[in-house]
Amino acid sequence: MPITDPVKLQIVYNRVLNKKVCRKCGALNPPTATKCRRCKSKNLRPKKGFKLK
């Protein structure tokens, strides 16, 4: 069942999708990270997910 409430959608985005993923080891990092917490690589990307309208 899709979530249509904009407030709940924002909560889901911040809780689930607002992260960075290390391209080297796959670890999840906070959105403000500049280096990976596990392998110290600087090769991070934002987590893929849906786009907010």
From Swiss-Prot:
Q: Name one GO cellular component term.
A: ribonucleoprotein complex
Question: Could you tell me which InterPro entries the record lists for this protein?
Answer: Ribosomal_eL40_arc (IPR023657), Ribosomal_eL40_dom (IPR001975), Ribosomal_eL40_sf (IPR038587), Ribosomal_zn-bd (IPR011332)
Q: Does the keyword Ribonucleoprotein apply?
A: yes
**Keywords in UniProt for this one?**
Ribonucleoprotein, Ribosomal protein
Indicate the family of this protein.
Belongs to the eukaryotic ribosomal protein eL40 family.
Originating organism: Staphylothermus marinus (strain ATCC 43588 / DSM 3639 / JCM 9404 / F1)
Example GO molecular function = structural constituent of ribosome
User: What are the recorded Gene Ontology BP terms?
Assistant: translation
- Please give the name of this protein: Large ribosomal subunit protein eL40
NCBIfam families on file: PRK04136.1
